[in-house]
């Protein structure tokens, strides 16, 4: 299955529920008027795009319809793809320009954090990079065990301490091992909780100091893993973590299991955070780099009138 087909399949639930309704609504109109835009805005909010983003999309559509003299309601879907592509375009690449580079992965329990790390390690290894994992989410024994399973599956080394160990010490040992083995990428599973923002900030700043001391000037990504099925709650979670953690991007998992695919737009617009990867299935290669144009095409597919 090709890249676009994977994303299209992963967004099927969102497309079936919301995009189907938008298509039906547009077919019911014979002209483009204010009522059409009001109905469209409501449907976008239902897709977890968020009120502000839905309003912004419709305002942009109004302006373009006027500029281009568009009168056919069925042209709106193509315009929608265009506007959404522009909206979610940004710095979606991973910046891994040094040897080693460091990826810190954070997120609350249950969002698919460990699975994401395993899939990311597999992807980077397939690209010819040597990867080493650090089990620095030491709060849960299960997190360490799950990461070991993924390390074995991806055939990459893992550095771990006992449950309850200092996460910064794990990161220190992982960096030391990476330097000794000339690894290309260090991926550390870090903070899996957000009940105390100060503790989280302290933990992450301590980890950052360890990295800065051990690998000055290294490329560093701080990725937050979010569960798409939680919709607007994912946006709220991202807002909290953004304040505490200096995020560089988002990994949005479980997109295939929800009709809330519009949350990608809310994260991008409300928080200014790029989505770097999306999870669209269970398989290792179902963690896909985010592509704005393919996402917009797959989400707002124009359908011929029945």
Q: What are the functions of these language-model segments?
A:
Residues 1-8:
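Compositionally biased, charge-rich terminal segments
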Residues 2, 305-306:
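Short acidic DE-rich linear segments
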Residues 13, 17-136, 143-188:
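Primarily NTPase-proximal linker/entry elements flanking Walker-type ATP/GTP-binding cores
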Residues 16, 304-305:
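Terminal, Lys/Arg-rich, intrinsically disordered segments and adjacent short helical elements
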Residues 51-53, 140, 256, 284:
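Short hydrophobic/aromatic residue motifs in ordered secondary structure
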Residues 106-107, 189, 225, 279:
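Short beta-strand segments
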Residues 146, 163-181, 195-304:
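Conserved catalytic-core segment of NTP-binding enzymes
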Residues 191-193:
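Short glycine-rich anion-binding loops that position phosphate/pyrophosphate groups of nucleotides
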């Amino acid at each position: 299955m090709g890249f676009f087909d994977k994303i299209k399949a992963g967004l099927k639930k969102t497309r079936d529920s919301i995009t189907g309704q938008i298509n039906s609504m547009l077919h019911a109109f014979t002209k483009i008027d204010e009522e059409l835009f009001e109905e469209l805005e409501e449907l976008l909010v239902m897709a977890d795009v968020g009120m502000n983003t839905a309003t912004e999309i419709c305002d942009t559509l109004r302006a373009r319809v006027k500029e281009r003299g568009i009168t056919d309601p069925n042209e709106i879907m193509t315009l929608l793809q265009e506007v959404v592509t522009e909206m979610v375009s940004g710095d979606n690449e991973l910046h891994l320009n040094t040897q080693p580079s460091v990826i810190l992965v954070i997120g609350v329990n249950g969002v698919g954090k460990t699975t994401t790390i395993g899939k990311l390690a597999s992807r980077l290894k397939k690209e010819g990079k040597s990867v080493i994992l650090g089990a620095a989410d030491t709060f849960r024994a299960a997190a360490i065990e799950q990461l070991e399973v993924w390390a074995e599956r991806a055939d990459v080394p893992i550095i771990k301490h006992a449950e309850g160990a200092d996460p910064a010490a794990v990161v220190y040992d992982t960096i030391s091992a990476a330097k000794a083995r000339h690894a290309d990428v260090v991926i550390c599973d870090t903070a899996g909780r957000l009940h105390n923002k100060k503790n989280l900030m302290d933990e992450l700043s301590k980890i950052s100091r360890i990295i800065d001391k051990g690998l000055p000037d290294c490329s560093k990504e701080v990725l937050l893993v979010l569960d798409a099925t939680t919709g607007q709650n994912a946006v709220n979670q991202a807002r909290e973590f953004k304040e505490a953690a200096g995020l560089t991007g988002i990994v949005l998992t479980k997109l295939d299991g929800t009709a809330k695919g519009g949350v990608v737009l809310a994260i991008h617009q409300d928080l200014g955070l790029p989505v770097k990867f999306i999870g669209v299935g269970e398989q290792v290669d179902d963690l896909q780099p985010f592509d704005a144009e393919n996402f917009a095409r797959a989400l707002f597919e124009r359908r011929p009138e029945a």
